[in-house]
Design a protein with these regions (language model features):
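Acidic, polar ligand-binding/catalytic clefts
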Residues: 1-37, 108
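A ligand-binding cleft/hinge motif common to bilobed small-molecule-binding domains
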Residues: 1-10, 78-111
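Ligand-binding cleft/hinge of the Venus flytrap
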Residues: 15, 51-68, 96-97
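Beta->alpha turn/N-cap motifs
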Residues: 1-4, 20, 28, 48-50, ...
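Periplasmic-binding protein-like
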Residues: 18-26, 51, 93-151, 153-173
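Short loop->beta-strand "edge-of-pocket" segments that line small-molecule binding or catalytic clefts
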Residues: 35-51
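Short helix-initiation/N-cap motifs at beta->coil->alpha
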Residues: 30, 65-75, 79, 111-113
């Protein structure tokens, strides 16, 4: 789950193990070149996502088309109901690789953010246990091994593991 101040009020986050940034996916033939171009277009978001929250707060004048599920949002983009789909870049990199004809804009919407497991608010014992285990897994480069085995083939060839992994729960944000 992406760590946000609002979510910190509801859950206890462990140390982060991944990092993500919100970017936008557009059709390959789109005239949209950068985020400024989206100010006068329709941007699709999935309700409750980091992209939805950030755009609603920082660009209240942008036209947002909201859907409940990622699959609905992506289908809406494919059907031409919007000009771009804003979402966590890992989702977009994977989708663009599997669906030729789309590209991810290089600019990010806001800063890079940590992703971390979450536990019930107040369960400090479980949070601390997870943090200890994350540190042990980091020493073994466990997430890098998982990345190589499962994730690397899903993302673009130029995606560097350190751009998405916070091995051992270490976050430099």
């Amino acid at each position: 789950m992406t760590v946000t101040p609002e979510r910190k009020e509801a859950v206890e986050f462990t140390n982060p193990n991944l990092k993500v940034a919100v970017q936008a996916l557009v059709p390959q033939a789109s005239t949209v070149k950068n985020l400024d171009d989206l100010a006068t277009r329709t941007t699709i978001v999935t309700t409750g996502t980091t992209a939805d929250i950030w755009l609603t707060k920082n660009h209240p004048d942008w036209k947002l088309l909201k859907f409940e599920k990622n699959s609905e949002s992506l289908q809406a983009l494919a059907n031409g109901r919007g000009d771009a789909y804003a979402q966590d870049n890992l989702v977009l990199f994977s989708w663009a690789k599997q669906n030729p004809g789309y590209r991810v804009l290089t600019q990010t919407l806001g800063a890079e953010a940590p992703i971390a497991p979450a536990v019930k608010k107040g369960n400090i014992e479980l949070r601390d246990w997870v943090n200890v285990e994350l540190a042990k897994l980091g020493e073994e480069k466990f997430l890098l091994k998982l990345y190589d085995q499962y994730v690397r083939k899903e993302l673009s060839d130029d995606t560097k593991p350190e751009s998405v992994i916070g091995e051992g729960g270490k976050w430099q944000g």
